From Swiss-Prot:
The protein, known as: Protegrin-5
Compartments, as annotated in UniProt: Secreted
Origin organism lineage: Eukaryota, Metazoa, Chordata, Craniata, Vertebrata
Gene: NPG5
Coiled coil: none
Region (Disordered): 61-80
Role this protein plays: Microbicidal activity.
Organism: Sus scrofa (Pig)
Family: Belongs to the cathelicidin family.
Length: 149
């Protein structure tokens, strides 16, 4: 009788643990990779853009050192380029070819790797091109050029 009761109790605990595991999603299932978080930022850029064509990730700078907390904002820096796909098509940008002489934008800000929290703070500025061997980023009133020269 005592062993039946212990067995029944153990069975109930196993059932509770199983149900708890199904209800509480694991942290790793909710965490994005650094690249996935940046691609999500590019999607947001395309959603909020008023420009005619979609942008696609062109270059991704090195990720920051590993941080265990996916909810902590991570600094990010990446470059996007205009594609041939019109924005209204809603086609995934990864399937679009880059537009010849399309606009290029340098983007900086922060992203989180947590799928539940969604704070993105990204600013993108158009890259005006190369001047005297230097890459220049321009805003309405001034340009900043980096590199040789």
């Amino acid at each position: 009788m005592e062993t039946q009761r212990a067995s029944l109790c153990l069975g109930r605990w196993s059932l509770w643990l199983l149900l708890l595991g199904l209800v509480v999603p694991s942290a790793s299932a909710q965490a994005l990779s650094y690249r996935e978080a940046v691609l999500r930022a590019v999607d947001r850029l395309n959603e909020q853009s008023s420009e005619a064509n979609l942008y696609r990730l062109l270059e991704l700078d090195q990720p920051p050192k590993a941080d265990e907390d996916p909810g902590t904002p991570k600094p990010v820096s990446f470059t996007v380029k205009e594609t041939v796909c019109p924005r209204p098509t809603r086609q995934p940008p990864e399937l679009c070819d880059f537009k010849e002489n399309g606009r290029v934008k340098q983007c900086v800000g922060t992203v989180t790797l947590d799928q539940i929290k969604d704070p993105l703070d990204i600013t993108c500025n158009e890259v005006q091109g190369v001047r005297g061997g230097r890459l220049c980023y321009c805003r309405p009133r001034f340009c900043v050029c980096v590199g040789r020269g």
